[in-house]
Every structure is written in structure tokens, then in C-alpha cells.
């Protein structure tokens, strides 16, 4: 069993190299085998003015950056790197935001103190099923998460998916599906800042102690984080590095952060929100020419 699993890890590394070299392929309808991925989304844990910048620009209370007072052009935003830290915004920043995700995002909505925010979440959802699983009901009509999102316009869209996908061992499919979803979000939300949140680490010791699935590893999770960073660079959307903010010295989620090794405790959901509030960027900063790249 362990020999077979180690070979899966080796294969994952080989596939990652191929994916990073290939870039986004045309829309890929292969979604991996459902038999290889169990649902990991059931949790038992759920417990004003402008700020001047050194270059003369300013950041308003809602986190929007303006050009320097002398009218000079700011350096182009570097989509290949994680979003840099910015002055903290308050919860009102998220009033025109939508959050897409699985049960981890559901926990963020419930336990972080973010307030009333539009969420498009579903327990057990994966990037492979985002365009096919009718998980959202609006006025008695069932929609996929992508279809439901198109019913309203937002200025920010946050997406965080990948834990339920770890068992598929389909890295190219994960990458291609993520690219397609970002394209779909851009099409339905042309004026939104899109934030891809990478995956917060797992605590493998806790998962093992609770008899959790062997495929839930930080090694494969880091592969997915590399892939989502590449998606952000290629599609020119914002990449948020939650992993680095939460990983412990041993390369895992701290033991006190989760009772099942996957979902967070209340204090850590609050820390997640604080990270989001200190990593924001305006649409104008990202796309000074007035339109997001395709």
C-alpha cells in the first residue's frame, strides 16, 4: 500500500512539471474519477480617511489605491507574485464581494465575523464540478455555482478550492479546470477584482490520528498551490498566499488550529479574515488600461 502511494507522489511530481511547462489547455471536460476522492468537507470543529503611501499615492478606507499626486504612472502590478500587504480595510470592503468555495470557505463565512456577505459555497464541491453540479437554489431554481454567480454583479470575487480535489490525482485537469472557471468569472463579472486564495496547509498528524484519508497531504497541497499561482499569473488575477501565513515550522497547519486537521477553529478563521483585510488591491491598479486581460 505504501509503495503504491509513494509512486503516486512521484507521479504527482512528474505531472506538476508537465503542467507548469504546458500552460492552460483548452477547456478540459475530464474531471477525474469520483471513486478516488472522498468528501472531506464535514467538519466537527466549527466552533475612514486616505492613507498616504511613500510614492505619494493614497489608499482609501475601502482599500482602493489611487495614482501618485504628481500623476506619474505606478509600476505595473506583478501577477506572478503573491499580493503584497496593504493598509487594513474594514468589513465594509466585502459588502460588494462574492466568495466561492467549499466547507472551509463556509466556515470563514460563519465564524470569522465577516458579517453578511454573498457566498457561493457547497460542502464537498470541487473545481471539477463547479460548472456542472447544481448546488445553489435561487427563487426555486437550481444553478451551478458559476451560473448563480452570473445573476448579480460584484466588485470583488474570492475563490478558494482544492482540498476536495487532492484525491483525484489529476493535476493537469485541476489546472485546466481552474483556468476555465477564472475565464467564466471574468465573463460574468467584468469589473471585479478576482482573488485566488491558495490552500491553507493541513495537519497530517491530526488527520492520521482520526483515520483520515491518506491522500490528504501537504506535499500534494503544495503542488496545487504552485498550480493556482500559475493560473493567477496567466489569467492576470490576484494571488493570495494563505499557505505562508498559516504554515508552522514543521510544514503543517499548527495542531491547535484544527480538530480534524482540515477545517479551522474559530480563532484561525478570524486570522484568515484579518489576512484578507490586509491584502487588497484596486481594479485600477491591476488594469490601468481599463480592462482585465483574457
Segments predicted by a language model, with ranges:
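Generic structural signal for well-ordered alpha-helices
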Residues: 178-182, 225
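Structural recognition of the beta-strand scaffold that forms the well-ordered cores
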Residues: 98-99, 156-160, 193-198, 238-241
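Catalytic His-Asp segment of secreted/periplasmic serine-dependent ester chemistry enzymes
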Residues: 202-294
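N-terminal, intrinsically disordered, polar/charged segments of Gram-positive cell-envelope systems
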Residues: 27-96
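Bacterial N-terminal signal peptides that target proteins for export
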Residues: 3-11
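Conserved SGNH/GDSL esterase-like catalytic core that processes O-acyl groups on lipids
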Residues: 87-177
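C-terminal motif of bacterial Sec signal peptides marking the signal peptidase cleavage site
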Residues: 21-23
